[in-house]
Amino acid sequence: MSPDLTHRSPEELTPEDSQAIGDLARRAARADGVDPLNEESLLALRHRTPGRVHVLAHDQDRLVGYGTLAHGSAEVVTDPDARKAGLGGRLLDALLEHDPELLLWAHGDMDGGRRLAASRGMVPRRPLWRMERPVAGEFSELPPVELPEGISVRPFVAGQDDEAWLRVNSRAFADHAEQGRMTAEDLTARTQEDWFDASGFLLLVDDTRDGEVVGFHWTKVDQLPVGEVYVVGVDPERQGEGLGRVATLVGLHHLADRGVETVELYVDGDNRAAVTTYGRLGFERAAVDVQYGPPV
């Protein structure tokens, strides 16, 4: 008997639904070695973020599949014991009914994700690289931080710096599908996560302009010994001053001081300038996610 599909609005999601989806994602991650849902999707579950589509697949009382869609971006996850029976395709079709032009994430770009995308006529549209570098042990020495004259570094202060950071973030990521649309609510949700540490949310400020925020490096340590370059940004008005490299190094030194041994980051594989910059800082590609969509 085929699993039953149920559509849920964010308001209709129950705590039991969210728990079951989290359990399903963990089962899939153990089997595949990669998380099937990104941070935005997981936060949306916890906070029941408006405007998101949820499709749940139950085999009797057991959740065996889940699909989610928001802002034209979709993810699908199936239970390892319920695969190769067309369930992933059914979930994707349900999401395509809401948005025929959606883009589908294939985390880890494994064979199953490729086949699912190809079965619906989708082609690779956007590669997202995970890059890594050591910050402890042999061959891990970091270049020194050389702050430009007039620039200093301080931690983010919640309730004081929100508006200034959101302004720089939206300008720095105006062309970025996810990061550029971050709202005050999104910022607050992340600062309330267990991993959040204000001392690792570092702002570059211009002391000659009343402490104006001109760049930032938000680091993340969820579980040692791995840390993350969560997001680095520089105000476009200040590009060309070397602040991107400075911000990156400030955060890397902070992570090393916290006891992190390996730092990872995510970058669009098509962004050759960013890939080159990170490569010069010792980062190498470790994995890739691919977003699939209709042919352009």
From Swiss-Prot:
Belongs to the acetyltransferase family. MshD subfamily. Monomer. It catalyses: 1D-myo-inositol 2-(L-cysteinylamino)-2-deoxy-alpha-D-glucopyranoside + acetyl-CoA = mycothiol + CoA + H(+). 1D-myo-inositol 2-(L-cysteinylamino)-2-deoxy-alpha-D-glucopyranoside binds at residues 39, 178, 220, 228, 266. This is Mycothiol acetyltransferase. NCBIfam families: mycothiol_MshD (TIGR03448). The keyword Protease does not apply. GO terms for biological process: mycothiol biosynthetic process. Keywords: Acyltransferase, Repeat, Transferase. InterPro entries: Acyl_CoA_acyltransferase (IPR016181), GNAT_dom (IPR000182), MshD_Acetyltransferase (IPR050276), Mycothiol_AcTrfase (IPR017813). The lineage of its organism: Bacteria, Bacillati, Actinomycetota, Actinomycetes, Micrococcales.
